[in-house]
């Protein structure tokens, strides 16, 4: 019986996931659109910055891992523009602690650095010369609602709600990050 359950679990991992496929398709479209000049003059780099919100830490980690794998296997094209430009998943717990099946522990310093390197113009510290200290290292940020309040991510061009929270005000808070 346990062997059969293990087989079922393995085959369920191979089943197509239409929701993830739709996310990947949306990212392709957004990256392609960011390549074209915009009438407002907004930079291509800022327009392809995307925040993907999910309610659950497990989902955030899964999305991150699957996107990283997809980007590394795709030929040169729109979604491969994001290769090596996806930040570590941001949730309310350390990724290593979460993978061990435990919860708790928030890496505030690491989160602040990631945010500053995702949106250096709006979320990083300013040095004495008036320039942002963060580097523009990331274009995709996958996060739980831990980043839905009190974080200035206005440099991002898009928000994707991978799943919807039970409280509709959470959606308003998520969208308030980019105006």
PLM regions: where:
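Conserved SF2 helicase motif VI
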Residues: 167-179
């Amino acid at each position: 019986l346990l062997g059969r359950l293990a087989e079922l679990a393995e085959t369920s991992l191979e089943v197509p996931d239409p929701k993830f496929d739709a996310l990947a398709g949306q990212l392709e479209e957004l990256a392609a659109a960011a390549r074209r000049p915009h009438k407002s003059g907004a930079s291509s780099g800022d327009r392809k910055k995307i925040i993907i919100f999910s309610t659950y830490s497990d989902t955030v980690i899964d999305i991150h891992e699957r996107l990283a794998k997809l980007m590394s296997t795709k030929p040169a094209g729109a979604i491969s523009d994001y290769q090596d430009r996806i930040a570590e998943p941001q949730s309310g717990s350390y990724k290593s602690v979460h993978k061990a099946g435990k919860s708790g522990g928030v890496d505030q310093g690491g989160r602040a650095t990631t945010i500053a390197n995702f949106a250096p113009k709006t979320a990083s510290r300013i040095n004495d010369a008036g320039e942002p200290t963060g580097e523009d290292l990331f274009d995709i940020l996958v996060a739980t609602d831990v980043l839905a309040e009190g974080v200035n991510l206005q440099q991002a061009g898009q928000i994707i709600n991978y799943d919807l929270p039970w409280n509709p005000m959470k959606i308003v808070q998520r969208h308030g990050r980019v105006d």
